[in-house]
């Protein structure tokens, strides 16, 4: 049941085919924390919002000045219809759960995410995603600047660099968010 004091949404960020491959050989096991969080949110009527990165054909959104994204346009991948930008089959949206397309690292960048959140009067975000030092960090910072209350699910975030993940979870994120495990978050819902 949704807490009446705060209206919460779970953000599932960048769990798309072209990115989840970085989780390694045991993909199904690596996705378990995300699946648990999604299931719990649905059971407690908490909106689940999926976020992906994808670009238009011809990449008009990508500046050659953008070091991180300009290489993507050279590969001819990551367009909105490309298989790499589709949400992975193990964590698919259901029914009317929105899939937000962003054009930069933050889930807010160029997307309609803030409009969706404000329309539903959501003031608390639960963040999960790949990567911790990418979409999770950028979205957390922007969400904090927009005055959202923030929770980060430490075991439903991943970064190829475990040191970056650890430093962010233990030293940086706690300044602006509550960092907890999926199981601890689920316990707070009951």
Predicted regions mapped to residue ranges:
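Active-site-adjacent betaalpha module
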Residues: 1-9, 36-44, 70-190
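A short alpha/beta connector and helix-capping loop motif
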Residues: 6, 24-41, 45-54
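Acidic-leg catalytic submotif of subtilisin-like serine proteases
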Residues: 10-15
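Short acidic, Gly/Ser-rich segments with clustered Asp/Glu that frequently serve as metal-coordination loops
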Residues: 16-22
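Active-site loop signature of alpha/beta-hydrolase-fold enzymes
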Residues: 18, 56, 159
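Early exported N-terminus immediately downstream of N-terminal targeting peptides
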Residues: 47-48, 52-71
């Amino acid at each position: 049941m949704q807490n009446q004091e705060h209206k919460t949404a779970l953000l599932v960020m960048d769990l798309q085919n072209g990115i989840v491959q970085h989780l390694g050989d045991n993909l199904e096991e690596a996705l378990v924390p995300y699946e648990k969080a999604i299931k719990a949110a649905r059971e407690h009527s908490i909106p689940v919002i999926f976020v992906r990165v994808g670009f238009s054909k011809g990449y008009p959104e990508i500046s050659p000045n953008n070091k991180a994204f300009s290489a993507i346009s050279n590969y001819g991948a990551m367009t909105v219809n490309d298989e790499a930008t589709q949400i992975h089959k193990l964590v698919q949206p259901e029914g009317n759960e929105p899939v937000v397309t962003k054009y930069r690292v933050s889930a807010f960048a160029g997307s309609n995410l803030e409009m969706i959140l404000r329309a539903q009067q959501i003031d608390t975000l639960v963040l999960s995603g790949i990567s911790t030092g990418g979409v999770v960090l950028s979205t957390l910072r922007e969400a904090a600047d927009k005055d959202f209350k923030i929770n980060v699910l430490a075991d439903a975030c991943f970064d190829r660099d475990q040191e970056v993940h650890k430093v962010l979870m233990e030293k940086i994120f706690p300044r602006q968010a509550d960092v907890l495990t999926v199981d601890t978050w689920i316990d707070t819902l009951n």
